[in-house]
A protein has these predicted regions:
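Generic N-terminal amphipathic, Lys/Arg-enriched alpha-helix
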Residues: 1-14
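A polyanion-binding, active-site-adjacent surface
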Residues: 16-138
Length: 138
């Protein structure tokens, strides 16, 4: 896993975990995934939530279950998808609730990086899944 993407503050928070056996095992399994076991999101996006949201800027955590498991659907932020993807029902529901509750249509793209850059940590409880298999790494 590419932990170099993490903000410096997250690295100092997590660095003790990086040397523990459980983390090394997870890291080894992710790095050894063959093309037959593609991960969602792509390996370079596994820690994207910690890349886009700095710890000192953190305002709120929105927790999802696991990444979308469709091909090129998950981008590393919970509920977010790349702009070229169809809006999934869960994200559509979030946008609908914001509109209904605040009488305001969210001015953000489906990739939700605008929110992440403002201190919204969009984190899934499971950072990866196997392509095509929901809850496969729970």
């Amino acid at each position: 896993m590419n932990t170099k993407q993490l903000h410096r503050e997250w690295i100092s928070i997590f660095e003790k975990e990086f040397s523990k056996k459980y983390f090394q095992k997870i890291n080894s399994e992710v790095n050894n995934c063959s093309s037959n076991e593609l991960l969602c999101p792509k390996k370079e996006n596994i820690f994207k939530a910690f890349e886009k949201t700095n710890f000192t800027d953190l305002k709120i955590v929105i927790l999802g279950q696991d990444p979308y498991h469709g091909n090129d659907q998950a981008n590393g932020l919970a509920f977010a998808v790349s702009e070229n993807q169809k809006t999934p029902p869960s994200l559509r529901n979030i946008f609908t609730e914001i509109k209904n509750d605040l009488n305001h249509h969210p001015q953000t793209k489906k990739n939700l990086e605008f929110w992440a850059n403002q201190g919204v940590l969009l984190l899934n409880s499971s950072l990866t899944v196997k392509l095509g298999t929901a809850n496969s790494h729970s």
